[in-house]
Each structure stands twice: as structure tokens, then as C-alpha cells.
Amino acid sequence: MCIRDRHKVVELAVKYDKLIDVHCDESDDPMSRFVELLTALSIVEGIGPKTTASHTCSLGSVDNSYAFRMMKNFKKAGLNFISCPTENIYLQGRQDTYPKRRGLTRVKELYENGINVCFAQDSIQDPWYPAGNGNLMNVLDNGIHIAQMMSFEEMDNCLDLITVNGAKTMNISDIYGIEAGKPANFIVVDARSEFEAVCERADVVASVRNGEYLFKKAPVAFEALSEFMA
């Protein structure tokens, strides 16, 4: 997608009042800076909260001076970011010898600067990521490792990266979440806290859609086979 194409995308989004999601700067090249143009256009048109830059891997290759200057503009625009950690760690940096780049955008810095960022997966068992299965808990597990976001505070809040932050990106916060009057769409994980859910790789034990169970799992039963375990 060239510069003219991005102008056209924004023009159409404004005309028809639509959301924008651009696969942007999915490259290790630090000079790939289409996100700068997207940010500028979203500020001019006032559509930042409706605009999402996906991947932005090149932000992981640029120097800090440029990156933190852009953070101010991202926040001013109200831009959303989507990172696909499993795909990006697999696809990016393949041409590097060593040191080898991780290929991820600056998730931690975006998060710490109050910019909306979420995790996703855009490849399901395809050539770009053969192991993709749509399990966002697995994506989150990979993402917080690669982005080095594993302090107690970060792990206590990291489920936001695959829940409320994604809802904000999709502009559905008004119908998302566990609140009276909102659709009952959620999954249940076998954990007592967010930290435990992530740390223990908690299993999904139920899924509810529009108030109806899609599935429920029976509790796992263990049998002690030795005196030590009894």
C-alpha cells in the first residue's frame, strides 16, 4: 500500500463513517514509517479512535529518539495499535544473523504511554503462521514474554490486552464487558485471579454466547497412584 492508497483509505473512511485497520509497517526496516502518515491523517480528520495500526514491526527497529517523539503523536491522535506477537516473532528478523530482532512493535512503551494497544492473531494454520489456532490466551502468553511485560502489576492487568483494549480498538466498549444490560458473551477460565490465569496457563472451562453455553468442560479428576500423592 503506497502513500496515495493510505490517503484514499482515510478519505473513504471519513466519507462513509467507517473504522480503519491498516497492516502498517510490517517490516524490520526502520525507514518504513507509514504509521507516521496514518497518524498525521487521523489527526487532521479527527478519526484517531476509529483508526488502528496493526503490526507496526518497524517501530521495534527505530531509535528511541524517533519512537518517543511518535508516542506523543500517537497519543494526540488517539490511535489504536494491534500487535500479533506469535506471527511477528516468527516472521520478522528472519534476514538477521545475530543480534536478531524480535520483530515486535513497542508494546510495552505504547502501554506505558497510555496508548491503546492489544494483542491478536491474524493467521490460522496458514503459511504465515502454521501454528495459529485462535487461542488468545496462548497469544497473550507469548506476547508478555516477547514484550517483557511480566512484573506483578503488568501480569495482574495483562488480560486487558486481549479483552477491553481489543473492544476499545473495535469501538464496541459500549456493548462489551460484564455489566447489567450488556450482551452475556464471555469465557470462563479455571483461575482465581488474572495473575493465576496467566501464570498457570488456565484452561477455558466454559464459553457463553448471548447468555447460552456454547460448551462446558467437566472438572478434571485426579487419582493418587502412590502413597506419596495420597
Residues of each region from the PLM?
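Histidine/acidic residue-rich metal-binding segments in metalloenzymes
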Residues: R4-T52, T56-N80, D96-F119
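Sequence context surrounding c-type heme c attachment/ligation sites in exported
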Residues: M1
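Short Asp/Glu-rich motifs
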Residues: M31-R33, G93-R94, Y129-P130, E200, ...
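Conserved protein kinase catalytic core
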Residues: D29, S61, W128, E196, ...
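His/Asp/Glu-enriched, well-ordered alpha-helical/loop segment
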Residues: A40-T51, E87-L91, R101-V189
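C-terminal cap of metal-dependent C-N hydrolases
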Residues: A180-A230
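Active-site proximal loops enriched in glycine and acidic residues that flank catalytic Cys/His/Asp
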Residues: C24-E26, H55-C57, S83-E87, F119-S123, ...
